[in-house]
């Protein structure tokens, strides 16, 4: 079972860049691991650090600003997660501590991979995202509330509605990843297997 996602309130960091691709999110040289943990240390590695080994933080990159330490909601621009298909991208984001990414649009494969890893991609209009960037920049350290049950983002004194398809919403609300969905049918699977001839088991 994955962690259930119903509502999250968190610090917002504004990444004011469009077409952020998966190689920027987690560069290819860090993809050797086969577990989901440890990728957060290399999130946005080429932007966060001045050296390849990730020892010298780049003071001009927004994730390194003191006021955004501990951020769990990433505010981004259009076509977030484009580029090559790698599930390591949402792994890196969640391992770093992100629960939500808000953007005007997402690359299709990244969008699907996010749900599989309990990272909520929230799509709002360009105008709404512009408003949120202005709000965050005027109020560094502001927190947003993201309510998946009600499908709204509460930011300052405004509320923004978003839409998630019913199946993905159900899975996140109930903490169901691909394994969890399969286990919901465990009894039926076992019954089917028991009906098979011995030579087929």
From Swiss-Prot:
Pathway: Amino-acid biosynthesis; L-leucine biosynthesis; L-leucine from 3-methyl-2-oxobutanoate: step 2/4. GO terms for molecular function: 3-isopropylmalate dehydratase activity. Belongs to the LeuD family. LeuD type 1 subfamily. Heterodimer of LeuC and LeuD. It comes from the Bacteria. InterPro entries: 3-IsopropMal_deHydase_ssu (IPR004431), Aconitase/3IPM_dehydase_swvl (IPR015928), AconitaseA/IPMdHydase_ssu_swvl (IPR000573), IPMI_Swivel (IPR033940), LeuD (IPR050075). Keywords: Amino-acid biosynthesis, Branched-chain amino acid biosynthesis, Leucine biosynthesis, Lyase. It catalyses: (2R,3S)-3-isopropylmalate = (2S)-2-isopropylmalate. This is 3-isopropylmalate dehydratase small subunit 1. GO terms for biological process: L-leucine biosynthetic process. Catalyzes the isomerization between 2-isopropylmalate and 3-isopropylmalate, via the formation of 2-isopropylmaleate. Its EC number is 4.2.1.33. It is an enzyme of class 4 (lyase). GO terms for cellular component: 3-isopropylmalate dehydratase complex. Gene3D superfamilies: Aconitase, domain 4 (3.20.19.10).
């Amino acid at each position: 079972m994955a962690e259930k996602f119903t509502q999250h309130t968190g610090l917002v960091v504004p990444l004011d860049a469009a077409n952020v691709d998966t190689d920027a999110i987690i560069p290819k040289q860090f993809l050797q691991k086969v577990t989901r943990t440890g990728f957060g240390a290399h999130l946005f590695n080429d932007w966060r650090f001045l050296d390849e080994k990730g020892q010298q933080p780049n003071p001009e990159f927004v994730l390194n600003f003191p006021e955004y330490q501990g951020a769990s909601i990433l505010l981004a621009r259009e076509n977030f997660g484009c580029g090559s298909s790698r599930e390591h991208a949402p792994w890196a984001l969640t391992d770093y501590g992100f629960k939500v990414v808000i953007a005007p649009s997402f690359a299709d494969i990244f969008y699907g991979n996010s749900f599989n890893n309990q990272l909520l991609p929230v799509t709002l209009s360009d105008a709404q995202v512009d408003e949120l960037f202005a709000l965050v920049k005027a109020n560094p350290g502001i927190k947003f509330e993201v309510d998946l049950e009600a499908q709204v983002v509460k930011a300052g004194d405004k509320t923004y509605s978003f839409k998630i398809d019913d199946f993905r919403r159900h899975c996140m609300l109930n903490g169901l990843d691909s394994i969890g969905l399969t286990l919901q049918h465990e009894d039926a699977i076992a019954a089917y297997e028991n009906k098979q001839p011995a030579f087929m088991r």
